[in-house]
Structures are given as C-alpha cells and as structure tokens.
Amino acid sequence: MAARLLAFLILLAMVPTAIAEDGSVMRIDHSFTLMEYDPGIEDAAIHPASNWVVVVGAEGYAVSMDKSSPSTMIPLADISDSDLLDSDYHPGGNTALIVGENGSVLRYAISDHSLERATSAQSVGYDTMQTVSWNANGEWAYLGSSEGTLYRMRPAGNGSSEIVPMPGTGGSAISSIDCLPDPFVCLVASAEEGIGMIDRDHVLSWIGGSSSTWSDIVCRSGGVPVCIAISMDRSIAEIEFESGVVGLDIQTLDGFSGTPRSISLTSSEQILITATPAEIIEHRPSGDGTFTWLTNEAIVGQSFGVSGSTITGGWDGDSGDHWIITRDGTVALLVPEETGVAQGLPKLVTMLSFGIMGVMAIGIWSTRSSR
C-alpha cells in the first residue's frame, strides 16, 4: 500500500489537479434552493443520452431538471401523494421508472415529460418499493421493497405491465439493485441476507455479507467489471467476476468518521460514496484506495446551504463540474479546486480488509439475452 500511495503522490505532482488544505479536490461554486419548504428529495436519476435529471421526493414530489442548468426544471404531473424513493432510466434513455411508498410505481417519459402509473399498487402488494433497476438490455426492471419483496416487471402493451414476484429474499428488506451488461447479472443489497445476485434466468442467489446491513450498491462495467456495496457500519464490499467465478471481498473504512449513505458512478466511472454529515469520498477498487473528494470540513466552511442537510443525489455537469442535491432541496455546483490554491494532499482513508468473504462459481459470463 505504501508503494501505491507513493506512486499516487508522484502522479499527483505531474497533473494540474489542485487540492485544498482540507484534502478536497472539489469545492462548492454556488447553490440555489428548489422551494421555500423542504421537498424531502430522495433520489436523482440521469442517463448518458438524456439531458434531463429526474428528481423525486416526499409526498409525490417529482421534477425534471436540465442536467447542465438545473434551475431550468419542469414539474411533473402530481399523480401521487406518497413518498417517492428511487428511480432508474431505461437503458434506451427515453423513459424512467419511479418507485415509492404504498406500492407506487410510476413511468416518466422524456418526449413530453409526462408521468403516469406504470402498474397498480395492488400488483406489488401496496409495499414500500424502495429500489428499482433495469437490467442491461432493458427487457426487465427489478423492484425491491422494505418489506422484503422482490419483483420483475416489463411493459405488456396497452399501457399495462407484467409483474412477476421473485422468491428467495428471506423476507429481508431490499435496499438497492444495480445491473451489469457482461456478465449479464444484477446485484442486490439487502438489510439482513447480505448481497445477492440475479442471473439471466431471474434466479436470486445470496453470495455473502450477511453480517452487515447493506444500504446501497453500484456496478461499473468499464474495464474490469466490479460492483461496490456500502453499509452504514462503514463496510465496503467489492464483487468481482472472473471466468464465471464471483468473488466477494469485504473491507471496512477505519480513518473515516462519517456514515456512508449512498454510492454512485460518474460519467468518467469514478465511484463516489456520499456520507453524513455531508461529505463525499472516492473509492478505487482492487486495493487502489479510498480518498477524500469533498470533505465535511470544506462543506461546513463553504456552507452554501449544504452542510446542514443530507446529500441525496448527484450528476456530472460540464467540463469536470458536478452537481449535488440535498434532501431539503439545495442544489449546488461543485467545481475542481483551482490551480494555485493552498496545496494539501488528498487524504487516504484506511481500509482494513476482512479478506475474501465469499466465492462462488456460477455460469454467468457472456449470458446476454438473445432477445
């Protein structure tokens, strides 16, 4: 690890990236608020082919924002008074599914910024649907609930949807789902059963990590495919795939005082972990370290309405910029630290490894659907 850190510092000296004394590589440039009252923002979904960010929150709050100029926004139809908790774009980028409390499953269309019910609440048992993710080819979406139910769903024509319950959750709350194109699998983070994997035949298998309560998971398909899960007890799981063998490695953050809340992927495939109190760190898989990105010290010092809330979403802007949104509706632009500021070093967050916690051989490689 010392050799890796030395190599990183040498590389750092060769590139124009500036780093503040507190270890941040980004700073807040400006911010604005969505409204006078707290909209309870829970999620922001973006697609590389779309210019619109879908933002959802409490009591049916839903807007579509221009990703480069989010003050340009379109309120979506008020068709639900339930809290909306998660959203995901179809791989085609033209529609997105939104899920929430009381069996809420909505469909957003970019073409006319319409919002409609994608299926009845009864079809998902009126459960609190807290996560949704499309598989890589867009044939099926997987929906998970806080009650421990898991469904797969696809359009069935005439505005209706086919809903199929999936067994094997053990009744554990499903916190998050994300999918890969190759291997053609989806990974599931749960509160009690650990981390699971859905194969191309829609079979759920648990691969390990049941000692932690996993809150979020993200998969990166570029380069070597990997999925990263986080838990509020500061555990980080890396799921890797090699020749049909799935490996699960769990580590813990030791030099970090925040509570990880969510994990996301930027357009440049940086893996960012958002924590409370408000802070963002960057995780680099395969033992390459976890580093400060925007520290809580910087957020408190710069304020802009971010420090007293929880960061609940983010997306890339232009030319290395990054937008974040907080639960209380503050939208802030992050920009790279300027060359010439007082130089510090990115802080390396210590990772204590628990070793390989689970390995399973399964025929998953190159299993894209023929449809």
Describe the role of every protein-language-model region.
Residues A2-F8:
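Sec-dependent signal peptide recognition
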Residues L9-L11, F32:
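Transmembrane helix-bundle segments that form internal channels/tunnels in multi-pass membrane proteins
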Residues A20-R371:
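Residue-level hotspots at or immediately adjacent to binding/recognition sites across diverse folds
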